Amino acid sequence: KTRGAARFVQDNPANAIYIRCTPVGGTLTAMLRQLGTALKLPATRNRLELSMAIHDRLKGTDKVIIIDEAQNLRFDALEELRSLSDPDDLTGESGTGICLIGNSEVYSRMLGKQEAQFAQQFSRVRFRRRYSTADVKLADVEKLFPTLADGSHGKELAFMTGVCRSKWGIRGAMSVYTNAVRNENTSLDGLRGIAASMGVGVLS
């Protein structure tokens, strides 16, 4: 997820804003400050002024805001992001695109499995799509690990696909492979050994 977001930002530097939300950065104030910094706005301690400045700066642009680790966002921060995506009441002009990247917690919260307020908020999102590591395909894994996609590493690719689809996801798979490379053994046994030492399981 993070690698995909980073690639999108690299390919679209003028139109993409990337923010990583840490556990202490999920408050409305922290989120506004990160957005303000990304948009090169003057620093201010007044949240209303900063919010208005962000809205003004984004108005009429074709930017997309990508929030990584979005499960750390508080409700009021999510509500502020939703307001950025709303169309202009007077002109009908489209709002800013918002992409939330996180674990299944943020999706469950937005669906209302934990809090009704998130369900109400989620129902106002007009275009929603969920992507999960369980949807990772062999073709995706071949692109992530091209050295294994030479036609002679089918078992290794299948193993890495299982890691990608597990709760450790693509990030866990990347860690397993990186450590296997450092260990100079990317064979199936080498990958399995590294995964076992890291406590990483696999979905078959």
What are the residue ranges of the model-derived segments?
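Conserved catalytic segments around the Walker B and adjacent sensor/switch elements
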Residues: 10-24
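Conserved nucleotide-binding/hydrolysis micro-motifs of P-loop NTPases
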Residues: 23-26, 72, 102-108, 135-138
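Sensor-1/coupling segment of RecA-like P-loop NTPase cores
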Residues: 73, 86-118
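Conserved alpha-helical scaffold flanking the Walker A/P-loop in AAA+ ATPase domains
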Residues: 44-63
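Walker A/P-loop nucleotide-binding motif
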Residues: 1-8, 24
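Conserved P-loop NTPase "ATPase switch" module shared by AAA+ and STAND
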Residues: 57-77, 81, 88
